Amino acid sequence: MFRWSAADRSVIVFVLTSTFRAAASSAPRNIAAAQPACNSWDEQIHFRDAYKIASGRNVAWTEAELDIVNRVNIKCNTKEENELLRNYMDKRNAEIVMKEKKETVLISYDKLAYIPMAVFLFIGKCLKLPFSALFAFGKLGNLLMYIFVMFWAIRLAKSRKILLAFIAMLPTPLFLASSYTYDSVVFSFITLGCVLWARETFFGGNRYHTPSVLMAIFLFTVGCLSKAVYIPLVLLMLLLPQFYKKSKKEKLLVFIGMGMLFFVVMATFVLPIISNTVSGNLSYGGDSRGGDTSAVRQLISMIKHPWSSVKLMVGGVFQLDNFRNLGRAEADNYFFGNLMFLNFASHGTLADKWSILLLPMMTLLVFQKEEGSERIAKFHIFGKVYAWLIFIVTIMLIWLAMYLSFTPVGEQQIAGVQTRYYLPVIYLGALLLSNSKIKVEIKEYSLAKLSFIVANILQIAAVWELLLQGRLI
């Protein structure tokens, strides 16, 4: 299973090296430019949860840490100002101003994605790093986890290898990986899970490779614990060809097992809303940041107006112009591809002109003719329909979750949906688009070099225009 092919040696080593080179050159600059302030999406919440895990049962907060938790950002426009901010925050880290005691040291299932960041925060605290260094060091745990998991996703992929490497090197995925967030864990784990599933489904032998199957189920599950909306993806395992060669009893056991796993994880998302609806707790499930939001009242509204709700959901998904990226009207003026791949959150998004590089490169990689691609294109019609159904249901659940929790009750548009939520299903979507009619024939090595060049141009442009220009020079 883990043996390099001849084609891999000439192409994939180069691609993987490119991924590490991009991560090594750009991600630390993203970390450094963000010190010590919140710049990514809800970074104050993610830092708080990671810091609590790192602190054990007794959590001690300093003024600097509470500034981050409360997102008290001080804007810096020069190197000198940034240095002053670091010194200021380091001084505010000298005295403990608040303590809290957690009920247990056990980590909640939906907080497992914070472990890489928490481990590095714990190490940094043991080393007594100044706060600015500690804040950056915690992000390093997230980055290393991302590189490790994506390395194996690219390494093990039998199809669309270069596409995976290209996406892994783009500005937004690397920016997320060098921030406090669970998004990079969700993205990388689900992507690797899809890779292992695709190996067994399209390129497997007559028997399961049991470690791959178990690992895929594990990765899907862990990747979905922080965002349960992706859990339908675990049902892809029922498409494994070997499943249909089992006895009726074995099929039933596998079916029940997958079904139970699906419903247990979905229950973490659905049951609290249903139980609070039944009990009449109308305030449950609102956005903690404010606004007239309530998952319970929104669900009641949907039940009262089912057709309008379905029409709103379907319209929102297919219009592609309703991504509320930063909560500002001007954030919707960007091409959704730029919002997904060329976006540095509060730092801004690269202008639409850069999609002239992004779109053609993505098209080449998605429709690249490669060895074994015909196996995917000729997959039986039931399997394709089933996989597309899972893909669509997952997308709909993303929008439903945002409609319930982040959209004011009765609003005629869905707020809170961001294009980065689509990242975990990008690889699956690329596989499903494989067909026997649209093919791009180009040498793999040439395509790998081209993708590396384009990814680095976009990365350099993002770092220059969004982080450095007019600020730190």
What feature does the model see in each segment?
Residues 1-29, 253-260, 378-388, 445-457:
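Start-transfer (signal-anchor) and selected internal transmembrane alpha helices
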Residues 129-132, 150-171:
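Transmembrane-helix signature of polytopic, membrane-embedded enzymes
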Residues 179-186:
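Short acidic/glycine- and proline-prone juxtamembrane loop motifs at membrane-interface regions
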Residues 128-147, 323-399:
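Membrane-interface anchor segments at the N-terminal boundary of transmembrane helices
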Residues 174-175, 211-228, 233-239:
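Membrane-interface alpha helices of multi-pass inner-membrane proteins
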Residues 55-137:
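Interfacial juxtamembrane loops and adjacent helix segments
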